[in-house]
Curated annotation (Swiss-Prot):
Disulfide bonds: none annotated. The gene is yifB. Belongs to the Mg-chelatase subunits D/I family. ComM subfamily. The lineage of its organism: Bacteria, Pseudomonadati, Pseudomonadota, Gammaproteobacteria, Enterobacterales. It comes from Escherichia coli (strain K12). One of its GO terms (molecular function) is ATP-dependent peptidase activity. This is Uncharacterized protein YifB.
């Protein structure tokens, strides 16, 4: 037969829409025409496929060849279409007899020798293929990725000849070996931090409720050290979360997928990171740092040094848990539900009071004004991490609570939240806040008066209630008491700092 159809998958973000490769061989001048919105890398497939077919012992048809990648309105890029094009060519030229070709999907790049190479986004392609009821054949290079799925519908091959022999029923293909989580010893323990008890408490609340945290303090007080300990307090990823994170990571760094399997992402971009690097971008948009931090932590050190427009671009993803990237050739949505942890100095010199202060209140306010009010509103907790008191370093250090001990309380609090509302407190919307964060009338009036004094917004009111709800869950309390509210209000260091500076100016 001079016409053959092979199924494959594109890679558009974490989605893998189905693509049909149609090959027609007819009489006419020898040549190959490829249609269906192929990019340059796909057009180059004609040379790779030709050499791979010849070097695998087959004949390249010396006829007019037309290849259609359907649907035609979907942009296609990369070498992932090499294998399906080669198989479709061999089937159309009757060099390959495959009666069950419709039951399989093929994804892989071909070397000139006919060897198969891995492609980005193999996890998404395999997952979608299995959901559609077909089996998928991928390169052996992608074995570690598709092995995470533990699906019976994945097959791996290392050469075009092996795929052809399998489709003709002459040879069996291997299934990927299931991938287990790599066990790692905890490198950063909370007991390593000397003092800073309020900072440790704030970190516990942040981990328990999934909140966003801002650490403010002079240089060298342990802000970065505290932030790096948060992963030790968080639970391992569930199967669904692990596959989501692995699917995103496989688009940019497939080699790290197995190493980081089931581990919470912890992304710490440099403050010189561009807007595109942070939220994602490109002609066909790729994931940025906020998507790579999905289901994990995004840590921004030296917060005011980031470009203001880069930080303001995080405002919508923090609220919605996803980022919409619109470009001329593609519109892609990436998941971006992360915990934002940030650290900053209170002034350009690192201090805003005391003997070390070398800045006027105007200079300090100008420095803090690099951060917009709506962006600062997204932080549930802001803590001041002060200089350690004199003598604490010379005394014998008594280790504090370990990460394992604190993690037990975090897990118990999270269990209460999922049992009550099936989500973390940080993810509660307005109706759910009214339902699960009820206050006594006297406590509500006290909290409203406090917010008016601090000049906070309605969003800050809701975030304070969610933090108080988390504190109550840590205390195993069903109701939010005045004590819980007072502790939640105490974690508003940035507001107190701004009020202090305003008073100095008046």
């Amino acid at each position: 037969m001079s016409l053959s159809i092979v199924h494959t998958r594109a890679a558009l973000g974490v989605n893998a829409p189905p693509i049909t490769v149609e090959v027609h061989i007819s009489k006419g001048l020898p040549g190959l025409t490829m249609v269906g919105l192929p990019e340059t890398t796909v057009k180059e497939a004609r040379d790779r496929v030709r050499s791979a077919i010849i070097n695998s012992g087959y004949e390249y048809p010396a006829k007019k060849i037309t290849i259609n990648l359907a649907p035609a309105d979907l942009p296609k890029e990369g070498g992932r279409y090499d294998l399906p094009i080669a198989i479709a060519l061999l089937a159309a030229s009757e060099q390959l007899t495959a009666n069950k070709l419709d039951e399989y999907e093929l994804v892989g790049e071909l070397a000139l020798t006919g060897a198969l190479r891995g492609v980005p986004g193999a996890i998404s392609s395999a997952t979608e293929a299995i959901k559609s009821g077909r089996k998928i054949i991928v390169a052996k290079d992608n074995e570690d990725e598709v092995g995470l799925i533990n699906g019976e519908g994945c097959l791996i091959a290392d050469h075009l000849q092996a795929v052809c022999a399998f489709l003709e029923g002459k040879h069996a293909l291997e299934r990927p070996k299931p991938t287990d989580a790599v066990s790692r010893a905890l490198q950063h323990d909370l007991s390593d931090v000397i003092g800073q008890e309020q900072g440790k408490r704030g970190l516990e609340i942040t981990a328990a409720g999934g909140h966003n945290l801002l650490l403010i303090g002079p240089p060298g007080t342990g802000k970065t050290m505290l932030a790096s300990r948060i992963n030790g307090l968080l639970p391992d990823l569930s199967n669904e979360e692990a596959l989501e994170s692995a699917a995103i990571l496989s688009l940019v760094n497939a080699e790290s997928v197995q190493k980081q399997w089931r581990q919470r992402p912890f992304r710490s971009p440099h403050h010189s990171a561009s807007l595109t690097a942070m939220v994602g971008g490109g002609a066909i948009p790729g994931p940025g740092e906020i998507s790579l931090a999905h289901n994990g932590v995004l840590f921004l050190d030296e917060l005011p040094e980031f470009e203001r427009r880069t930080l303001d671009a995080l405002r919508e993803p923090i609220e919605s848990g996803q980022i919409h990237l619109s470009r001329t050739r593609a519109k892609i949505t990436y998941p971006a539900r992360f915990q934002l942890v940030a650290a900053m100095n209170p002034s350009p010199t690192g201090h805003y009071q005391g003997n070390h202060n070398r800045c006027t209140p105007e200079q300090t306010l100008r420095y803090l004004n690099r951060l917009s009010g709506p962006f600062l509103d997204r932080f549930d907790l802001s803590l001041e991490i002060p200089l350690p008191p004199p003598g604490i370093l010379s005394k014998t250090v008594v280790p504090g609570e370990s990460s394992a001990t604190v993690k037990q309380r975090v897990m118990a609090a999270r269990e209460r939240q999922f049992k009550r509302q099936n989500k973390l407190n940080a993810w509660l919307d307005s109706p759910e806040i009214r339902q699960f964060c009820k206050l006594e009338s006297e406590d509500a009036m006290w909290l409203e008066g406090t917010l008016i004094h601090l000049g906070l917004s309605i969003r800050a009111w809701q975030r304070l209630l969610k933090v108080a709800r988390t504190i109550a869950d840590i205390d195993q309390s069903d109701i939010i008491t005045r004590q819980h509210l007072q502790e939640a209000v105490s974690y508003r260091a940035i507001d107190r700092l701004l009020i202090h500076l305003q008073k100095l100016l008046t």
